[in-house]
Amino acid sequence: MDLWGKMMMECCFTAAEMAAIGMGIDKDAFTSRMQGGPHLLAPTGSDLLRYDVGTTFAGFHYDLNFLTIHGKARFPGLSVWLRKMKKVAVKIPPGCLLL
């Protein structure tokens, strides 16, 4: 899990640098503030045998961090909410990440 978490963090840092460059600001404008931040690698780790079908493990929530990243899940249910409060299922292709 440490290697996977490290790769996900590197992806976030790279995306933040790319965003800064694209906005015409210093390359480290975001990453300098991300250093030492409260980064959390939090696999749900839920025991699906203990709960009924349809149980929600992580409902609608607000992330407090600058970026959120997800890998492909082994179970269905990852959704995002559009600005007009429409729920949309997320399908992450193999080998890709959702940022």
Kindly give the residue locations of the regions a language model identified.
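Peripheral, non-catalytic segments flanking oxidoreductase cores
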Residues: 1-99
